[in-house]
Amino acid sequence: MTTIADRSDAYCVVGAGAGGLAAAKNLMEFGIDVDVIERAGDVGGNWNGDNPFSAAYDSIHLITSKPYIQYDDFPIPDDYPTYLGRSHAYQYLSSYARRFGLYEHAEFNRTVEWIERRDGSPEWIVTLDGGEKRRYGGVVIAHGHNWAPRCPSYPGTFNGVIMHSSEYRTPAPLRGKRVLLVGGGTSGCDIAVESAQNATATFLSIRRGCYYWPKYLFGMPTDVVYERVLKWRMPRPVVRTFGKLFLRLNSAGQPERYGLPKPGHKLLEEHFVINSTLLYELGHGRIAAKPDIAELRGDRVLFTDGSEAEVDVIVYATGYRMTEFPFIDRKHLNWTGRTPQLYLNAFHPVYDNLFVIGYFQTSTGNWPIMDYQAKIMSRYIHLLRVDLKRAIWFRRAKATPVTAAQLNGGIKYYDSERHWLQVEHITYRKSLRKLIRRMGVEPPAPAEVPGSHPAADLAVPAQSSSAVAAKA
């Protein structure tokens, strides 16, 4: 009979990316013990350059500027760039983990195989790699949703190399090749630009038109301008009019002038595509825009407009499957239709000890939003333990269907898998902050807010034995 280690006084946090770290930190502030299970060898998720499971390429940069990506109680150093690249993002997250003592609670190179709840018990049995089982008082799922590649299927066969953008790291495999990028999201645009600077020829196949935002408007980060405009509380049609005007004045105007498809939806009804150089490369002829693929023909590709191109490498920048939970039965996630039905995408309507952090898609500012989710979670768990009467209102709230106004402020995103989890970040952020205020409780011993990041904080501590072994 398999022995089950008793950790019923603790929470199991699955994942040590930005969401998992925020979850662990907030739980620990309320004296709730945690084990953070991470399948890679360090914290940081996709931003950890040594993570073999990362889907990020070496040149990747955040599309959110410093003021809107940092955790509220852990400012990004002033000497970091406006848009963090992979190394700075990793340094920031690892510094956060060190400052709040999260490394001591993390178990690296471990995998959660299965999570189950046995009949009659509110606790969770977590099975780890090697068959080890533990009983936890609660579980926080923070494994992210950009790790299960989605690849299209086309008629015909292709004789060259096919890869998904999740496999792409550097432009080395593209040098001297004729490259076709499929997909017009941020990653597809970034890789297309790198290809244009290294490959013999670069083609970009885009099925659906979209609006392309530069990283700067009027000399300021685009998200800073966007936030300021929305504070004017203008009607949505007026915001769209201003947005189109900003794009025409500050970037390159209409995408169709560069051979790209015309957007078939209104401005703001999509996940933002932010890239300052794609249209420049298109305008200089180093990238050729193409419509959707009609057929693969050996070393050539036929497009829906009847044109053909000789191609050596195809890179599918076609996103990820958004609803992958391979370690827990869907019945535990209140699954209905295409996705789990969780209050504000995080809180189970029935279970008081199962939470999902980071299960949303937003155009900007997702790290602090994960932190707000974690703040609500930790406060709720704390109130359940010390003041059940004050916790009841949130138990009732999370059992009710969330309204569109709480998620997207009335914006109707066009139907696409990438939008299944899409929220309008300002509206969603306000909804979370409102709940935090209503909780009316702060950690007994609030974490010290650092004014700077000493150099020692940026050094990654040596990884030691597992947290459970350390507790033994």
What are these regions (language model features)?
Residues 206-210, 220-227:
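FAD-dependent flavoprotein oxygenase/oxidase catalytic domain
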Residues 2-59, 75-216, 232-389, 413-472:
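Flavin (primarily FAD) cofactor-binding/catalytic cores of flavoenzymes
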Residues 68-69:
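Active-site segment of extracytoplasmic enzymes that catalyze sulfate/phosphate-ester chemistry
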Residues 61-65:
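Flexible "cap/lid" subdomain of the alpha/beta-hydrolase fold that forms the substrate-access gate
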Residues 404-416:
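Glycine-rich phosphate/pyrophosphate-binding loop and the adjoining helix
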Residues 387-404:
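The conserved 3'-phosphoadenosine-5'-phosphosulfate
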